[in-house]
Amino acid sequence: MELNRSISPQRLGAERFRHRYGLTCAYVAGSMAHGVASERFVEAMTGAGLLASFGSAGLSHARVRAAVARLKGSVPDRRLCINLIHSPQAETVERNLVELLLRESVTAVEASAFIQPTLALVLYRARGARVGSAGPQAAQRIIAKVSRREVARHFMLPPPADMLRRLCEEGALSASEADAAGRLALADDITVEADSGGHTDNQPLLCAFPAIRALRDEIAQSFAAAAEICIGAGGGLGTPAALASAFALGADYVVTGSINQACIEAGTSDGVKALLAQAEPGDFAMAPAADMFEMGVRVQVLRRGTMFPVRAQWLYELYRQRDGLDALSADERERLERQLFRRSIDDVWQETRAYWQEVEPQQLALAEQDPRLRMAMVFRWYLGTSSRWAISGDPQGALDYQIWCGPAMASFNIWSRGVGLGKPEDRSAPAVALALMEGAARHLDALWRAPTVAPPQSEQPAAPPVVVEPDAGFIRDWLIAQIAQQISIASEEIDPSQPFESYGIDSGAAVMILGRLERLLHRRLSPTLIWNYPNIDALAARLSAPVRAVAGQPHGDRQAALPPG
């Protein structure tokens, strides 16, 4: 039983989205490249009823194959999601990944960095599509990350007919699959990505989201399948207020990114997590992207504690000004080899050459004939390796750490210090997610309950409000019901004299129960409250004691004066 509650985290966003992926909350942890969104990270999030996308970008095919094999055994099918990043210089890599995911029956991808459909993406959507009694149905789902209307349009319409035809001619699709896919939108869900870490157009969410949502509604008037597309919001989300703003805009789900890198389960080094936890507003910069270097595409990165943004920009300026490696001055070569590469340019080229020989021999053949392309490949070696130095925590490369990150990290740091999540070692990914969702629900609830017109002032001073404190028995029964619901057993099976640890409640579930308890009692509570008391009986007895008022604060703003335990 809960009192005076109209909004819960489970009600935020679209029920349709939660049902699609079997989620308790409409919350997604977006993919973080190079396995930063690790297997452990995905398992923790999906185990808490949330969605997370494995960060396959930048990993070898063998590494991704191993990750898929592990996740298939530990993650519910509907929640298994792998990042599919567009690889304009390596179409074979993209196609091979799609073939792997289809072969392993991975039913959802988070598609990122796509500007338009590709054969590989269309193949993933169309394979297994059929027309049933309920109409056309896809066997695989696509969650597309976009920031511009013209890109979003591609995902709201059916796959291009010429691509479906070509895949049929290749024997990759049957005629019936192509026909069914031609009646579906390319994507099930579209994330409007605002000012995010990594690839970003630095779009403000307040402008980008309504524009893309309106496009969905416009297209749905002539193409009914588009009406089923959920529109989510991502980029810049690092506090409960930010999530609440996204839901208030009409987001069907929210996506976080930067903030997850500093969580316990993230697949990056402790040094990177420490830098992220110290980030303040203004500690971010744009730098050239490794995957689209020649096109001038940029990514948002952490500037604090690293020289990467400055050095990467210098490489791009060299690329624009020089015709090839042989055109570099002696001073430029010396600086490259000593400060950035920490090895000779020839050694870098040999390593780069071996990589392209394995993944895309055609690109290597072009580079052998084009000095400028060869120079770009060498420079991209630094851009890619700087991420690996950061992830591994290589102390020799500390000044060159490339850490994809956006301003949400700074706002998250400021908020987290007040809720017991200020240190990386305290940041369990599910606990962070659930604390944000609980906070967003409280934020919206408070806003929507606030009176729009101030009541007239009485000539007589108002009597202090009467506050009814729930008794120990009521709180005890409430806690039993909450824990029973959380671990899916009957309330009668809960022994309130047993330690909390015996119920198998993780930190994420504890945070969620704590948020509900705060609203029930109309007071703020210690973030570690549940672990400070031996059992339900002891906690209920303490919470039923009168609240010690803080001078000058109304009842609802009092901090429960609870000893450490």
Mark where each language-model region is.
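Active-site entrance/lid segments in N-terminal catalytic domains of soluble metabolic enzymes
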Residues: 1-228, 258-260, 394-403, 407-459
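Short glycine/serine/threonine-rich phosphate/pyrophosphate-binding segments
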Residues: 37-40, 239-243
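Residue-level detector of anion-binding/catalytic polar loops
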Residues: 51, 107, 252-253, 524
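Charged, amphipathic alpha-helical linkers/stalks
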Residues: 110, 279-344
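Catalytic or ion-translocation cores adjacent to nucleophile or general acid/base/metal-coordination motifs
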Residues: 195, 241-300
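Glycine-rich beta-strand-to-loop/alpha-helix junction loops that act as flexible
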Residues: 230-238, 256, 503-505
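Domain-length cofactor-binding catalytic modules of enzymes
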Residues: 317-458
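4′-phosphopantetheine-dependent carrier domains
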Residues: 460-565
